[in-house]
Amino acid sequence: NIGTPVTLSVLRKGHAKALQFELLREDIQVESVETYDLSSSKQTVSYVRIKNFQIDTSRELKNKLGSLNMIDGVILDLRNNPGGLLEEAIRVSDLFLPGKKRIVSTKGTVVSSVHDAKQFFAAEHLLNIPLVLLINRGSASAAEIVAAALKQNERAIVIGEQSFGKGTVQTLWDLKDGSGLKLTIGEYLTPSGRSIHNIGVMPNLRLIPVTVPELKNGETELGRQEIFTTEKRFGLLS
């Protein structure tokens, strides 16, 4: 419960005795969207990383992009995004797609559904902005829904690796003993009607990952090199 203490025992390498730390439980809000300005003197390009799809991810993204006046291009990074809430994936896709464009459909053992763009946020300034989307083998589930929707509607150029390939709809049933039973009840289908399960989303342009040394701050030069190469390749920066 929030406000109650918890004691952690930490055994460090080279120490025979565990250290005790008392912490206070708190409700921690972690933002799922990060943005960076990659603009030149001529163009405004926004790099956006979505870590996962949680409550209000789409609104967070809309607000951050809306705070920039005149964006000339967006790089949407979904690498190592494990997924999350289906509704948020639909709304993120909706930000960049005009009304009635198919985003995803579900085919289930009991219930099936279709989800088309509805312009939830009426963000018309984002509909025609040049868009590059980055994926890799760690992009799964809801991240793949966004990638497939924007790729198959020819709204974004997808760059990177073939994605993970998790296209199942699951639900969790609570049992009387406090445990839970997770059941697969359907599958996601892309706008073209195809399943991505165990297949993934193929990028328009495949990049072969390489290992580079880490910098002191824990980041690598490769990330920024990939970003700027992407910008120049697709004309986001002149």
Name these PLM-found stretches.
Residues 1, 5-24, 37:
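PDZ peptide-recognition modules
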Residues 17-20, 29-238:
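C-terminal "post-core" interaction segments
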